[in-house]
Amino acid sequence: MKSVVNDTDGIVRVAESVIPEIKHQDEVRVKIASSGLCGSDLPRIFKNGAHYYPITLGHEFSGYIDAVGSGVDDLHPGDAVACVPLLPCFTCPECLKGFYSQCAKYDFIGSRRDGGFAEYIVVKRKNVFALPTDMPIEDGAFIEPITVGLHAFHLAQGCENKNVIIIGAGTIGLLAIQCAVALGAKSVTAIDISSEKLALAKSFGAMQTFNSSEMSAPQMQSVLRELRFNQLILETAGVPQTVELAVEIAGPHAQLALVGTLHQDLHLTSATFGKILRKELTVIGSWMNYSSPWPGQEWETASRLLTERKLSLEPLIAHRGSFESFAQAVRDIARNAMPGKVLLIP
């Protein structure tokens, strides 16, 4: 079979290997139909951030069951599934409480083991989520990134009737905007530095948009004055400036969910830190996208929203291609910003 393999120093190549075999009774083999490049893959590709090399990345994928182990009786060849990439131990105290993202002995498809940039993959039954028969198979590759924002909503006890502010209009942010609209947010505001992304956010239902390269935090806060209560802010950009911005614009008693992963140190001034106290903000750390019962209500909600056609995915896709085309699109990101979702279609 073919796969896209990463070596150190940003080398991306297409390789041939044997189709993997099922070795354990709780495993399934998936013939991959669509696999998406995640922003978290970029440090693994270009900054030697993977756990080992060579490695096949890819944790956002969907496909069809090709074979099942003897212990799997609820899935059959031809069934459509999406990847659930985290593999916690399920036995430690954290897992027994349903805190799967805090498992210290976890494995992860496409990071700590080879992933879905390939024609086939063998994974545990627990690592696939059954898709409805009427869902387009490509949509299934978006379930994992959709659940990232939904997990933040879950930790905040929902977004219904709240004034939701999404900072960062990348794929995660744009999906979260659509989910907030679909789940009954009172208002949705999008903040980014790209006018193109903000226009997309507006088309997805954002009531208003702020370009943070053109507006100051006090200006944004002034516009948000009538929406200052019952706020839920999602910081999805993952840069120190946007974390500080979130604190600056937050209304009293706002919830602030930190979703984006920082790759630079964050240094808060005493004045900014003081605003967390004075506004009595609730700061929520949001890590991955799992809850109990496994893999979590987030996954059921994502599936439902897709089935109900509440989410628009096509505008998020920048590139579709088979192995060589996909590999070249990945290489191109070294010279240009990631333009949107890049999909491998084996």
From Swiss-Prot:
This is Galactitol 1-phosphate 5-dehydrogenase. Disulfide bonds: none annotated. The lineage of its organism: Bacteria, Pseudomonadati, Pseudomonadota, Gammaproteobacteria, Enterobacterales. It comes from Escherichia coli (strain K12). Keywords: Galactitol metabolism, Metal-binding, NAD, Oxidoreductase, Zinc. Zn(2+) 1 binds at C38, H59, E144. It comes from the Bacteria. Its cofactor is Zn(2+). Gene3D superfamilies: Medium-chain alcohol dehydrogenases, catalytic domain, NAD(P)-binding Rossmann-like Domain. One of its GO terms (molecular function) is galactitol-1-phosphate 5-dehydrogenase activity. The keyword Zinc applies. Belongs to the zinc-containing alcohol dehydrogenase family.
